[in-house]
Amino acid sequence: MGAGEKTAAGMPRIGMGTAVQGPKPDPIRRAVLRAIEIGYRHFDTAAHYETEAPIGEAAAEAVRSGAVASRDELFITSKLWCSDAHRDRVVPALRQSLRNLQMEYVDLYLVHWPVSMKPGRFKAPFTAEDFVPFDMRAVWEAMEECHRLGLAKAIGVANFSCKKLETLLSFATIPPTVNQVEVNPVWQQRKLREFCRGKGIQLCAYSPLGAKGTHWGSDAVMDAGVLQEIAASRGKSVAQVCLRWVYEQGDCLIVKSFDEARMRENLEVDGWELTEEERLRIAEIPQRKINLGKRYVSEHGPYKSLEELWDGEI
């Protein structure tokens, strides 16, 4: 099983995602506990998901039951929401996340988007008045303070373009360990992966299956004919082919299913490989970004177009 393999930074290659529509604390607590029992060790949450508390409860329960010896066996990622992306709000925001998790530290703390909003703005839809300019240096200096205080073992970003990473690296004292972005066979991120590899930044893939069923997701990945043909010829599911492809790129992946059979299937990425011919066929899939982040773009806000948000990398 692939859940145990780790990156150089000690992050398990496969993590369980917990972004859900609407709070569902009890089902999440039960699903996370079951995931720990079947081998998951990496759990991905965020202040914005409102799933930190049930993850913390499941982790505590897993320690009590002996499913893990201690919290240290788990790798917990959380994220700074846009309304707290201000110099004086970053450390307090992480402390609140830690209270929610009932933990003393997170293994990884990410800037969720390169976006700042007025304090208190949590739920879409957002208006132009909600956005304020993103002071990357101020936010990152506060993220570095989280690391120095021992509240976050590692720090990183999410949804950053090559250009934004270049800017961040120009002044960061502690460079980002991870950039968590959308990666799947329909949005392969070749340019960003090459850039991150050259800078020692680990790419972590969210929505490796295209996030079908979410408000912004798409069927484009699971319905791709090439992937369906490869899956049929190999006796695998389309999901397994997608996850194997992402895994072979060297990325970490965040998978989300609360169904036990699927949770097990999503761990089965090793023990087989795509052939060179299959990889070439996947490389030819027409590319289009699924999670555009349109809600962060406003004609009177800091990002007036998707081109500006992604620096043309779409």
Curated annotation (Swiss-Prot):
InterPro entries: AKR, AKR4A/B, Aldo/ket_reductase_CS, NADP_OxRdtase_dom, NADP_OxRdtase_dom_sf
PROSITE patterns xrefs: ALDOKETO_REDUCTASE_1, ALDOKETO_REDUCTASE_3
EC number: 1.1.1.285
Expression by tissue: Mostly expressed in root tissues, observed, at low levels, in mesocotyl and embryonic roots, seedling roots, crown and seedling leafes, mature bracts, anthers, pistil, caryopsis and embryos.
Positions of the catalytic residues: 49 (proton donor)
Record Pfam families: Aldo_ket_red
Sorted UniProt keywords: Iron, NADP, Oxidoreductase
Catalytic activity reported: 2'-deoxymugineate + NAD(+) = 3''-deamino-3''-oxonicotianamine + NADH + H(+); 2'-deoxymugineate + NADP(+) = 3''-deamino-3''-oxonicotianamine + NADPH + H(+)
Pathway(s) this gene product operates in, as recorded in its UniProt entry: Siderophore biosynthesis
GO biological process terms held by the UniProt record: response to iron ion starvation; siderophore biosynthetic process
Binding residue positions for substrate: 112
SUPFAM superfamilies: NAD(P)-linked oxidoreductase
Binding-site residues, NADP(+): 44, 158-159, 180, 258-266, 273-281
Region (Disordered), start-end ranges: 1-21
Any GO MF annotation of the entry: 3''-deamino-3''-oxonicotianamine reductase activity
Source taxon at top rank: Eukaryota
GO cellular component, one term: cytosol
Functional description taken from the UniProt entry: Catalyzes the reduction of a 3''-keto intermediate during the biosynthesis of 2'-deoxymugineic acid (DMA) from L-Met. Involved in the formation of phytosiderophores (MAs) belonging to the mugineic acid family and required to acquire iron.
Family per record: Belongs to the aldo/keto reductase family.
Official protein name in the record: Deoxymugineic acid synthase 1-D
Source organism of the structure: Triticum aestivum (Wheat)
